[in-house]
Amino acid sequence: MYKRQTEQSPTPIISIENLDNYIHDNKVSVKDLYLQISSMGNEKPDIVEGNDLPDFNPDDEYLQEIKSPIFYAVQKNINIQTGQPTILDFDMQRISQRINIVFNIRTEGNIKREDLAAPIIELSGACGRFNIADACLDTTRLYRMAHQVQPDEFTQTGEGTYRCVVHFHTLGVIPSAAKGHLNGPGILQVALQVSTPQLDSSGAPVVDEEGNPVKNSRYIYGAINPYDELTAAQLIEVRDGKIYLRYSKEDVNIEITTPLVIKADQIVPNDTGMGWQPHDPTNPDDDIIIEI
């Protein structure tokens, strides 16, 4: 059997656990091989570290960010003869799932595009390890993934309106245990820093000693539980008490239709985030739509 791993680095983000043992020890079975995404341990991504943001899952480690799909292929019964070239054709199959998160931002007041920092997106409940032989997910430990929106993912759609589309490549996401939870697996968190000119009592902009405008800065954040949407997407399958990865060639699109509203008069110094506005906790299912 010949195996190919598609990503390699001195400290690989993607690795196959027990691969060396399998190659050199006949007692090790293919059922002992696990594909895993490296976690960051006690560290946090640079986009999160140092930012005083609400942490809905402080005990969960972050996975290293996967910026492209994960492909895997196996060739069995290969006959390689010494001194002769051997050409192998691999039928690479995508085994990761691509989840697209779509949400909108609306600003009110004197907030310009340059006043908005790139949003930070976090998704919890990510699986980091699964068995290659039977695609059974290891859910004994779940992780979270973080991504900062890139310029091509953040577009202005109108006066004071913006649209974000971000992508996560994952081995599977476990939904929340209940719709009303805002911690644990399956929680989507959005945070972005907003600046707005500071005004004096007469409404005139405040400037510093050098004549530069003084701005107030604040993190706006919100969390939402797309329980029904993750369940409907069928990212996982439960059989005989085990959880299996469900392969899908199609992306899963989770769209939050209720915009995150940012009001200039609420950007004040030394304050906490205003949360997801508007938000109706009695009707959480009305906030998100899904396209598979």
Model regions: which residues?
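Tryptophan-paired
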Residues: 3-19, 111-236
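Solvent-exposed, conformationally flexible loop/turn segments
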Residues: 81-85, 157-159, 233, 257
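Intrinsic-disorder/low-complexity loop/linker signature
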Residues: 83, 160, 200-204, 208-212, ...
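Extended, compositionally biased alpha-helical segments that mediate assembly or anchoring
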Residues: 215, 221, 226-292
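A short, Gly/Thr-enriched small/hydrophobic beta-strand-prone motif that recurs across taxa
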Residues: 92-107
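Generic marker of residues within folded, mature protein domains
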Residues: 80, 91, 111, 180-182, ...
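Short, low-hydrophobicity acidic/polar segments
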Residues: 3-95
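Intrinsic-disorder/low-complexity, polar/charged segments enriched in Ser/Thr/Lys/Arg/Asp/Glu/Gln
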Residues: 85-87, 98-100, 161-163
